[in-house]
Structures are given as structure tokens and as C-alpha cells.
């Protein structure tokens, strides 16, 4: 297995065959967040189902450091905006370029995405972790932001349709698993070092 330096386009290649797919062929489901009028300020409660915001989409996987909540009944009424473990969440308005997956170790069974986000459910061709890692590479970010408008609040034009037309190269599942394991190991080391530094500074 070769890990020699590659170009941005060849990120993650392990000397394996890659196939190119439009995202529409890699997902089973895509859904936009609710209209703003469907989640007003008076909808929020002290406990319930978490509603995601931009601070939850920093890094590769969902951050659970800060939430606002709606009742289970309200979340039920926003069924298409409910995101579950294994789903991928993308920002389409505001801080563009954000994309995370919800890990199987997530604290909650479900979440509600905001009006500035959309979610996808990957099919069996691609691991959600690999899918997200790809879009954190320079070439992935370029493709993700290719339909961005900078007039007013930054936003992706027609996000659900344009996103599905993006073509990406993916290897076989076994290679995806190797990449995910490698990057996961690096993330763990980085997190551990950060915790050590925080303890030393305390």
C-alpha cells in the first residue's frame, strides 16, 4: 500500500481502482432543512430533540457541545429534517464548506437540521465517513463550493439539485475502510494531544 505524496485530485489513493459517480448515485435520500417559519424562537424548550447549528458542523463529525431543543412532537412534525446516526449534514447557507457525519457513537438517536442545512443518507457504495473526508480535501471543497453565491449571505445555489450532480471518485469499500481507519487514528491522536495541552495549561 503506497502512501507517497499525491496531488489534491489524487488524495487518499492507495494504488487501487477508483470509479467516478455523481452524488445522486451514492445516496439513498436527500432532504432540506425546514423553512424558518417552521422553527420560531418560541418553539425552543429546555430539553428535547437537539436542533443543529453551525457550531455543530465544525470538523469531520458532529460536535455536540451546544444545542437548542424542540419537543419530540415538533421534531415529529419536521420528519424530513430529522437526521440520524450515519447521516451526513451539509451547510448550504452561511458558513459554506461545512460537512459532517453523525457517528454511531452520537449521544442522541436523532437531531433536527436547521434551515441553513441539508442532509443526505449514503447508500452501500460509499461510507459516510469517507464521503465527508473527501469533501474536506481541497478538491472536495472546490467541488462543494463551485455553485456558491457571494451576493448577500453566502449560499449554495439550488443546493439539493446541484449537490447531486457533483461527480466524485471513490475506491472500493475495503480501501474506503482503510482510509477511514487511518484518518480516524490521526484524529484520535490529535484529540489526545489537545486534551493533554489543555490539562497542562490549566
Kindly label every feature range from the protein language model.
Residues 21, 129, 133, 137-138, ...:
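Residues on a specific face of well-ordered alpha-helices
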Residues 26, 52-55, 123, 171:
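Structured loops at beta-to-helix junctions and adjacent beta-edge loops in soluble globular domains
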Residues 2-35, 169-202:
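Non-catalytic DNA-recognition/assembly elements of restriction-modification systems
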Residues 136, 145-146, 169:
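Well-ordered mid-protein domain cores that form the structural environment of catalytic cofactors
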Residues 16, 110-118, 149-180:
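A short glycine-rich beta-alpha junction/loop motif
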Residues 48, 66, 114-116:
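A generic structural signal for short beta-strands and their flanking turns/coil linkers
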Residues 20-41, 55-88:
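Sequence-specific dsDNA recognition surfaces
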